[in-house]
Amino acid sequence: MQTVRMTTAQALVKFLNQQYVEFDGKQQKFIKGIFTIFGHGNVVGLGQALEEDAGELEVYQGRNEQGMANAAMAFAKQKHRKQIMACTSSVGPGSANMITSAATASANNIPVLLLPGDVFATRQSDPVLQQIEQTHDLSISTNDAFRAVSKYWDRINRPEQLMTAMIQAMRVLTNPADTGAVTICLPQDVQGEAWDFPDYFFQKRVHRIERRLPTKASLADAVEMIKRKKKPVMICGGGVRYAEAAEELKQFAETFHIPFGETQAGKSAIESSHPYNLGGIGVTGNIAANTIAKEADLVIGIGTRFTDFTTASKQLFQNEEVEFLNINISEFHANKLDALKVIADAKEALLVLIDELQVMDYRSSYTVEIADAKEAWETELSRLHNIRFTGQDFTPEVEGHFDGNLNEYVDALGSQLTQTAVIGQINTLLDEDAIIVGAAGSLPGDLQRMWASRKPNTYHMEYGYSCMGYEVAGALGAKLAEPSKEVYAMVGDGSYQMLHSELVTSLQENKKINVLLFDNSGFGCINNLQMGNGMGSFGTEFRYRNQETRKLDGTIMKIDFAASAAGYGVKTYHVTSLEQLQEALIDAKKQTVSTLIDIKVLPKTMTNGYESWWHVGIAEVSKSQRVQAAYESKVSNLQQARSY
């Protein structure tokens, strides 16, 4: 047996360079690069290894650990999980910053490799700088917090443990049914310790991502279920995109006259104009998809996790005879809603079902319902695009909240722009293959409903964890994945203030991204939620503290986000009219550096709900009659929902 004497960190870098994936016969490097923020917990260990010989790994410099890990996740998501980035941080707060990103990746089933520095395995220096001491267990460090949010977690306390740890790490990272964040904790002393590693540990490894076939029994059950149903509806989840099964889903829909709604993760697998594409479904869905779903007698979930937003807290499907058929590579997700399970690759399952159902000459009983539903939504969409603020007689989409004081926002923001009109114009002016990235606030709802995807895989929404601050970093990750396309971060002022550090990284890397910042001076989405459930406006508007009341009910804060971003070297624009927006979008396309368009929009001018309900924890007892009424409404809605 040949051996190579290397440090743990050097061996790790060499191993990562030898990992490949194969999918449908195509082979490629699995780990494109590594994001780094160096500190004493990783710079002289893993940092030294990367400086000495990074191999083909591209080394990026992050600005915030959560930001760079979000970018890594976005890269893998845009690459359909076929290629990933790693991330390394120092010990303590540096590693803690990546915990949110680990949770985001795991919730979305997106592979990301996290390599946080850790405290000394020998404990000789305890307590080291940035170490937490737990008196009941000295083996615990900050990095144990990753256990709850990682799909695989390990700590390398001896150099030779690296081998089994990394073999297991690759198993999870390349397993479409169980992928997510993989965390390998690297004690800072062990990173620099040497060991004689066997050469076979560094051999080229090709991880084949197999397309799992459905069993004959589950397939037969599925065919029997479908053929006795008259009004089925499909839900196109993220699994359709990751399995690259869009053409098969289109063929299935067209052959059997079955419409489909889209989840946030599944949107843009198929262009929005497809005659069977009803658009977004669920809480943030539109009138077309939700109307059809309410009457459906069969719901065929394809690659979806059936979150509360997709099912409207399990209240959307109201047909008494409704049943569920779940096609998913993950048995865990396929097992939801008492569904008939087909545990298989989406593409393979659809192909076999097409063959079987064609033999039976199956066709749904829909006549004009699909076309009528789509036409009704197109009419509504046109109305949303053309909403203009008209002054005192104006009724916003989310009415009954700020109706009396919208003029205060007009004065503070210097704008009369409505959010729906802005989105409509952006959708019209962007290139067909431009990628939009979003995550949190009111924008995901508006975009799932309103955005017309004209090319496949151009809608990138992180809504499994809806992580505020993902947007700008996510845009960088998407740009690294598809450098030839324009990428736009669709972000509210709340999310932007939480995290936009990787905007600087985009400048450093000369990877142009475009930030479309919707400023309504508040956490508008949550303000809608609280006021829609009987509360007043409390802690969600961006107002100064009132020195008389001692509450945050003073004047509206005015922030010049364009001026702030310009200080980084970003090309910026200030927009308060549709004419200015058009000019800015056209000019931004000509730029070679990252851009930011600071768009001032009025609150309450986003879309509202369509035939859906969302279960939230409303107070059962309150002095407020409005809160009591909201609670009674919740009880009534729960009676119409499934219990699990």
Curated annotation (Swiss-Prot):
It comes from Bacillus thuringiensis (strain Al Hakam). Keywords: Hydrolase, Magnesium, Metal-binding, NAD, Thiamine pyrophosphate. This is 3D-(3,5/4)-trihydroxycyclohexane-1,2-dione hydrolase. InterPro entries: DHS-like_NAD/FAD-binding_dom, Myo_inos_IolD, THcHDO_hydrolase_firmi, THDP-binding, Thiamin_PyroP_enz_cen_dom, Thiamin_PyroP_enz_TPP-bd_dom, TPP-bd_CS, TPP_enz. The keyword Hydrolase applies. Thiamine diphosphate binds at residue 65. The keyword Metal-binding applies. It holds the Pfam family TPP_enzyme_C.
